[in-house]
Structure formats: structure tokens, C-alpha cells
Amino acid sequence: MKTTLSILAAAALLVGCESVSNRTLGTTAGGAIIGAGIGTMAGGDDRRNAAIGAVVGGLAGAAVGVYMDKQEEKLRQQTAGTGIEVDRVGDQIALSMPSGLTFDVNSAAIKGDFYGPLNDVSSTLIEYPQTAVDVVGHASSDGDDAYNQDLSERRASSVQTYLINSGVQSVRLRAIGMGETQPIADNSTQAGRAANRRVEILLTPIVEEGA
């Protein structure tokens, strides 16, 4: 069964540049956020998935795994040698962008060195449109909680905007700020804080209703 919402209804349900504040998510061994928690954020968001499906269509049955396999392979090829980590759990993919590529301390401006890898990622997202894309921003423990939450949201929004400007459909994208709540390294060291200043991109397949 195809998704039944019209494009106009989709626009009403989801205005492209949606932002989400800090929530609890799972993590991979490498530190990228994925797993049971992301089901609530992405795969379990029926209204959002219906809105995206109305625009790009949905996947059915065995096609889901094959589609994500091909997308994962392309992403690994595109990001080889960049330091971007690609993780896979079930039918979801997570990209973790290293701190050296992404943002300086206290900044939400994308570093110039990040443009090339981000362009490669955006080209793959355009080639494989039947996924919801959550852009998740993180901060180190420098500063207070409220400041870091705001900073992480602005970082996620910066990447979201860049992807939209690169041609990724805005209806697919959502920016999420996690503040300092999901560290992958020790915040007591300079190297650890640098590692915690990062952005992750989470991909969840859009599945047809009843599939």
C-alpha cells in the first residue's frame, strides 16, 4: 500500500527545518547515536515518515534491507579516508563526523575542511532519497548546560541547512541538539572535549504503510 498523504498534507505535517531538543538515545560501540532510542526519534515517528513518504515514496519488504545495504556501501566509499565513521545497526545507518572536521570551540560555523566530506554525504543522500535524515549536534562540557544545548542545536541546524542547500529535500531532514549529554570521550581532557564536539547524521528507511 502506498503512503496516502498528499504533498500538501505532508507540508502541513512537517515543515522542513524542524528542530528537536535533547532526548535519550542509544549509542553504537563507536559512539554514534543509534539503536532502540532512535526508533522513537525517527522510525517510530509515523506522522513524519508519512510526510516524507508522500514526497519520496516508501520501501517495501525485502527492498528495505537491500536499499540500505547499497546506501551503506556508497557512504563507506564516499567517506573512505576522511575520518567519518559509518555504523550500521539493523536497517539504520549512523555517520559520525570527527571533531577535527566539524566545528571549532564555541562555534556553530562549519569548518572549511568539512565541506568536501559533507558534499560527498549529501550526494549520497540525494541518490538514496527514501530515508529520514536526523542531524544530531553535540557539545563538550565547556560552558553551562543551557549554553551547550543551544550550541549543539545550532551546530545541527548548520549541517541541516548545508544539506538542504546542497539539494537534499528539506522534508527529510530534522535537526536535533543533544548538548553535552552524549559524550564519547573523557571531558576532563582537551582531546576528549574535542572528540565530543561533533555532529552525527542518522538515516532511517521510509517504509510503505502495511509493508
Task: Label every model-predicted segment.
Residues 85-87, 92-102, 132-136, 162, ...:
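Soluble periplasmic/extracytoplasmic beta-strand elements of cell-envelope proteins
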Residues 1-10:
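Sec-dependent signal peptide recognition
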Residues 138-208:
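Periplasmic OmpA-like peptidoglycan-binding domain that tethers envelope proteins to the cell wall
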Residues 13-16:
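C-terminal motif of bacterial Sec signal peptides marking the signal peptidase cleavage site
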Residues 18-74:
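Short, low-complexity, glycine-enriched hydrophobic/amphipathic alpha-helices that associate
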Residues 70, 81, 88-92, 96-98, ...:
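Extracytoplasmic
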Residues 78, 102, 106-137, 164, ...:
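Periplasmic peptidoglycan-binding/anchoring modules of Gram-negative envelope and division proteins
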Residues 34, 71, 75, 114-117, ...:
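Stable alpha-helical elements in mature extracytoplasmic
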